[in-house]
Amino acid sequence: MKEVSSLKREDAFYHKIMLMTGLDDGYDEWLNCYLESENPLSNIVLELACCGSDINKTISVLHSFCMEQPFDEAIVCNKVRAFFKDAYYTNRMSKEEISSTMYRLALNVGDPGDFDIHLWGSMYYLNDYCSLAKDGIIPWENFDFAEEVWEQETIHIFSLFCTE
């Protein structure tokens, strides 16, 4: 009989890429919720609990779990977008920090030329546009990307910096 865990692969992938980027965004609380609610504990929850503070092992376990079955990457994108929206509006991260973190996150997701979802590719290139704005090559005012990032299904890089 195959074991069924209530742990969602979308959540696992989200936490995997966040940990790979150096952000925990509530990982411990997320895992503790499963530790408290599952009875008996599923194998994946047990494996994650045994990782302790070993981030590399945790990432490896999450990666293996995510690769077992397909999952909805758009759900992950929405979680990532919500994280950056909150970080931006609560001033936990500046535009520069957000764009460089988005870049690192996109690198952790895959090949920038082969992103299935436009958000990952847009995050990859956004850091370049931030650098152009910092260097004065494009107007910094045009780099106020927050509303576009938070409200759209995908980020359309070229529309961010074109004024009409």
Predicted regions and their residues:
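Acidic, Ser/Pro/Thr-rich low-complexity regulatory regions
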Residues: 1-164
